[in-house]
Amino acid sequence: MSLGQRLALLAIRLQEPQRVASFQRLCGVEVPLGSPKAGEDAETEVRGAPGDPRRRPRQSGADGSPAKPDCCGAPNGVRNGLAAEPGPTGPRRAGSLRRNSLTGEEGELAKVSNLPLYYLFCFGTELGNELFYIIFFPFWIWNLDPFVGRRLVIIWVLVMYLGQCTKDIIRWPRPASPPVIKLEIFYNSEYSMPSTHAMSGTAIPIAMILLTYGRWQYPLIYGLILIPCWSSLVCLSRIYMGMHSILDVIAGFLYTILILIIFYPLVDLIDNFNQTYKYAPLIIIGLHLILGIFSFTLDTWSTSRGDTAEILGSGAGIACGSHAAYNLGISLDPSLHTLPLAIPPLTVTLFGKAILRVVIGMLLVLFVRDIMKKVTIPLACKLFGIPCHDLRQARQHMEVELPYRYITYGTVGFSITFLIPYIFSFIGIS
């Protein structure tokens, strides 16, 4: 057997849903006794891996393309068989915290015997969700180092955009359920390969160490410990949640390393362009909008389209905000002769100002996001003649989802790097 054949066989084995289910059982996640799914696991074991002739073929649309979710939210790949609601003594619904508001799906019933692992992996998977991003990036920009924060956003946008587009090109379904238990359902209508959670969970810690080491004084060993811990936690959490095969996670990790090798040397050039070039805002807005339109043409509706527009809008808004802040002198990076920067001692004043910036800043961010959401969706529906009585259906149109996500999160990003730092400066907590 040649090396290529061995690698192909290994890839097939790593994509088998049975391996995901085995990992879940190892971590204490099982189908509860009496669940309708419990009787289906044995049948699933004989379906085989991708490429195996015994494997049940994926249902296709009328044009031969992979099946997509309908208005009720049938996801890509195999639709989950949801168990009945638990009674007072029934098992916990382990995935209900990530209910998908756009498709109405919820996590499956599962018997979780290891709660510490469950909460650990819930935390790990949140490191790749919007809640984490909307806290993490502003915290860097407001409290730690805007220089590093801006560049982290550039890398994050690049990695996530390429990952989301690659998903819609490859179009591999999520692991079949059964035998896999879907503890999280929020992203189930997206494709699987590669894992963008794994990509984000790899790119952020690596980029964070690359950007800070030598700029800040700290032992390198801290970074060498942080990178594998962060990345492995996020990657394993996606297998634990039943969202990805082992192959998806490995591919996401390796894909991220390749992207960083190619594009990391350009990050400094991109950030300097965003801040200093006279017409940078026009180019930034136009380029990100074109990339968003392109990504929307790769496939029909899924939650990944809105996520892509959200990522691009955030990146464009943060870049434009940094341009305005730089040219108005609101946010200036320390001069090179002051490097490396020493980590200041934690005082009551320093800690108090940091907390104030986080609380005031996040309240303003949430306010801006809520206002823009209420304005952009009805406005887009009115402009393009789309009924807006059912927001779920309306947001499945590109004419609504793209401007809503792009404008809303573009405004949020602009607020993070310009409007909110200006307010901090005005009230004396910058």
From Swiss-Prot:
The protein's matches in Gene3D superfamilies, at most eight in alphabetical order, are given as: Phosphatidic acid phosphatase type 2/haloperoxidase
The catalysed reaction is: sphinganine 1-phosphate + H2O = sphinganine + phosphate; sphing-4-enine 1-phosphate + H2O = sphing-4-enine + phosphate
Q: Which family does it belong to?
A: Belongs to the type 2 lipid phosphate phosphatase family.
Annotated Gene Ontology cellular components are: endoplasmic reticulum; endoplasmic reticulum membrane; membrane; plasma membrane
The keyword Kinase appears for this protein: no
Name the UniProt record assigns to this protein: Sphingosine-1-phosphate phosphatase 1
Site entry: Stabilizes the active site histidine for nucleophilic attack: D248
- According to the UniProt record, list the residues that bear Phosphoserine: S101
What does the function comment of this entry state? Answer: Specifically dephosphorylates sphingosine 1-phosphate (S1P), dihydro-S1P, and phyto-S1P. Does not act on ceramide 1-phosphate, lysophosphatidic acid or phosphatidic acid. Sphingosine-1-phosphate phosphatase activity is needed for efficient recycling of sphingosine into the sphingolipid synthesis pathway. Regulates the intracellular levels of the bioactive sphingolipid metabolite S1P that regulates diverse biological processes acting both as an extracellular receptor ligand or as an intracellular second messenger. Involved in efficient ceramide synthesis from exogenous sphingoid bases.
Task: Please give one Pfam family short name.
Answer: PAP2
Q: Name one GO molecular function term.
A: sphingosine-1-phosphate phosphatase activity
Question: What taxonomic classification does the UniProt entry list for its organism?
Answer: Eukaryota, Metazoa, Chordata, Craniata, Vertebrata
